[in-house]
Curated annotation (Swiss-Prot):
Binds directly to 23S ribosomal RNA and is necessary for the in vitro assembly process of the 50S ribosomal subunit. It is not involved in the protein synthesizing functions of that subunit. Disulfide bonds: none annotated. It is found in: Plastid, Chloroplast. Pfam families: Ribosomal_L20 (PF00453). It comes from Aethionema grandiflorum. CDD domains: Ribosomal_L20. One of its GO terms (biological process) is translation. The keyword Transmembrane does not apply. This is Large ribosomal subunit protein bL20c. Its main location: plastid. PANTHER family: 39S RIBOSOMAL PROTEIN L20 (PTHR10986). One of its GO terms (cellular component) is chloroplast. InterPro entries: Ribosomal_bL20 (IPR005813), Ribosomal_protein_bL20_C (IPR035566).
Length: 117
């Protein structure tokens, strides 16, 4: 039986990793061992930060809504505003409310006046 050297398979795997790590700095883009380690680390960071990005955007939306609500002086706080939204069954999420707060404050004023009634 002939000996199989699996050179092509290993080279194909390394080139795939090398393409991924080509933008890394220093030895992380040149040496195979450090390339594989940095690839794993990059994928872990990407997975972790996808969840973090969702949290950060939610915090940003809440901050924007709260800032406009503090100016309106109709509601004392953000949580009362959201509570009254749910009570009146107004189905607007925080992302849409933040966009309305930035782009069209008068519309947010009318929404808050409808909630109070």
């Amino acid at each position: 039986m002939t000996r199989i050297k699996r050179g092509y398979i290993a080279r194909r795997r390394r080139t795939k990793i090398r393409l991924f790590a080509s933008s890394f700095r220093g030895a992380h883009s040149r040496l195979t061992r450090t390339m594989t380690q940095q690839r794993i680390r990059a994928l872990v960071s990407a997975h972790r930060d996808r969840g973090r990005r969702k949290r950060d955007f939610r915090r940003l939306w809440i901050t924007r809504i709260n800032a406009v609500i503090q100016e309106m002086e109709v509601f004392n706080s953000y949580n009362r505003f959201i509570h009254n939204l749910y009570k009146k069954q107004v189905l607007l999420n925080r992302k849409i409310l933040a966009q309305i707060a930035l782009l069209n404050r008068s519309c947010l004023y009318t929404i808050s006046n409808e909630i109070i009634k």
